[in-house]
Amino acid sequence: MTTIESKCSIDGILLLNKPQGMTSNAALQKAKHLFGAKKAGHTGSLDPLATGMLPLCFGEATKICQYLLNADKSYETIGRLGSKTNTADCTGEVIFCIENYTVSHEELIATLEKYKGKTKQIPSMFSALKHKGTPLYRLAREGIEIERKARDIVISQLKLEQFDGECFTLTVSCSKGTYIRNLVEDIGDTLKAGAHMTKLHRLYTAGFENNRMYTLDELQDMPLSQRLACLIPIDQAVQHLTPVILSDSEVTAIRQGKVISNKTSAVEGEDLRLYGEQSQFIGIGQALIHGDIKAKRLVSFAL
């Protein structure tokens, strides 16, 4: 195993395939150590039970973490009918059980249709959402329940992949803030059979549909040069934003906090990808009236 002994400037995005049984923060810290990065952050946690894509931002890439937090996600999940748990997944205590239930393939398909599109979801008490600074899951473990407001979510894909009468496998594409285990539980409630999630794998975060993920074991076995080659350029996380190329003098000006005049036809308030003349990523700008651009989040080096 090759590691970087002293922390250095590492900038880029790593698509980690998080292992089961590890918290997202623990996975982040292990990867940060492997790369010897000074600064690192993840873009939306996965429960310890879950596996799959966890984008990690190193160095200057941490400045665009929010765009990945806001991105749509796609998952594969398995639910089991016949019982509910206090956590809505297989790590919790069973709080409801029914033995004599019958759910047909057609009934399940019809139920899934009800959850497609725009809908509302009440987050679980066993979530990382905070109440007065305290994560809800900590309150839940103390037997405290806080009223939670239903949140707007969008489920763009909800496809039944397999069903054996008890366990069902789904592919789910959804907006940020969607709790898949709560979706599985809600489906079970609608079917009047109860359900809890037994498996969750994040297939991808929007923008990285075709990119490879790496496990911690794979990274540990790589020579340093190969490990660094796994990093993705920062601007790939914001490819959905309109690109704008600035001249060298404009790059200097915007880094000094000046507004660049008459440079874009984008709508006022729209975020933009900014590049220098040599296609180096400068950072994120924001469109103003009359086509002007101001800096919003600039990286401090030329890629």
From Swiss-Prot:
Enzyme Commission number: 5.4.99.25
Positions of the catalytic residues: D47
Pfam family, one: TruB-C_2
Enzyme class: isomerase
InterPro entries: PsdUridine_synth_cat_dom_sf, PsdUridine_synth_N, PUA-like_sf, PUA_sf, tRNA_psdUridine_synth_TruB, tRNA_sdUridine_synth_fam1_C, TruB_C
Gene Ontology MF terms: RNA binding; tRNA pseudouridine(55) synthase activity
Signal peptide residue numbers: none
Reaction catalyzed: uridine(55) in tRNA = pseudouridine(55) in tRNA
One GO term (biological process): mRNA pseudouridine synthesis
Family of the protein in this entry: Belongs to the pseudouridine synthase TruB family. Type 1 subfamily.
Function description: Responsible for synthesis of pseudouridine from uracil-55 in the psi GC loop of transfer RNAs.
Protein name: tRNA pseudouridine synthase B
Species of provenance: Legionella pneumophila (strain Lens)
Lineage: Bacteria, Pseudomonadati, Pseudomonadota, Gammaproteobacteria, Legionellales
